[in-house]
Amino acid sequence: MTIAAAGTRPQRAEGRGHLAAKLFDGRTRIRELYQEGAAKIRLPDTFDASMEAVIINTAGGLTGGDRMDWSVDAGPGTRIDVTTQACEKIYKASAGIAEVATSIKVGAQARVDWLPQETILFDRAALFRRLDVDLDESAEFLAVEAVLLGRKAMGEAVVSGLFRDRWRIRRSGQLIHAEELRLSEGVAALAARQAVLGGQVAFATLLYAGPLLEAYLSKVRPLVEGSMGGASAWNGKLVVRLAAADGFSLRKILIPVISALRNGAPVPKVWNL
């Protein structure tokens, strides 16, 4: 029988996935595909010129000390929708912080829709998430990030923990949007404040950067009326923020908004499985 030595670092989930695409014969095709560790990328068949990429964490969730790195490079003229196989679960951390870093590059006349399903935080989870995006002057980009502070239907609640979310979006090298969210220690008490989430436990941020700002804004605003949220467009970007009592209520608003920002296209099929 082998006994682990005292002080041995517990096994951690680590992974790195990279996808690069090119335009070939009028369709988006693979240029590079790399997978390492717990990171996997699957490419379902599509019936148009676009590509759909489903990223998977085979570890089934993350806890303190785990790390996942994703990168996407959309070449000129390509179209890529990136989503996740399921909601990412962030479990209680006994030590350390789980990290997820995503880097996206969108070339000339290309579009990337970053559409991961919700991240579910459990009590005493610790997560630092980063999103870095570089856009060509003529590129389009849509990002959606939704978070659940526990699953209300399961009786779960996040009382304490750490969640940091950092976005940096650049166009032609110039910063056009930055996010810096931090929920720490007394998460439940912080979320209860009216200036934060007003007691809601499900929330989402959506960002669109591209030439259809005004058209999309006119479609989105009626969809968020009557909910806890809002939509604004300025400086070449459209930002939507939503909050709801639970994940189901959030999806009822979120999915129509995503579709509106995709010119009527539905969310990826894996969202409905």
Curated annotation (Swiss-Prot):
Q: Name one Pfam family in it.
A: UreD
Looking at the UniProt entry, the stretches that span the membrane are none
Q: Which GO terms describe its cellular component?
A: cytoplasm
Q: Which UniProt keywords apply?
A: Chaperone, Cytoplasm, Nickel insertion
Localization annotation: Cytoplasm
Q: What is its main location?
A: cytoplasm
- Its domain of life? Bacteria
List the molecular function annotations (GO) for this entry.
nickel cation binding
| Entry annotated with the keyword ATP-binding | no
The family line of this record is: Belongs to the UreD family.
Outline the subunit composition: UreD, UreF and UreG form a complex that acts as a GTP-hydrolysis-dependent molecular chaperone, activating the urease apoprotein by helping to assemble the nickel containing metallocenter of UreC. The UreE protein probably delivers the nickel.
Q: Which PANTHER family match?
A: UREASE ACCESSORY PROTEIN D (PTHR33643:SF1)
Instruction: Give the function comment from the record.
Output: Required for maturation of urease via the functional incorporation of the urease nickel metallocenter.
Q: Which HAMAP family match?
A: UreD
Q: What is this protein called?
A: Urease accessory protein UreD
Q: Which organism is it from?
A: Rhizobium johnstonii (strain DSM 114642 / LMG 32736 / 3841)
Q: Which gene encodes it?
A: ureD
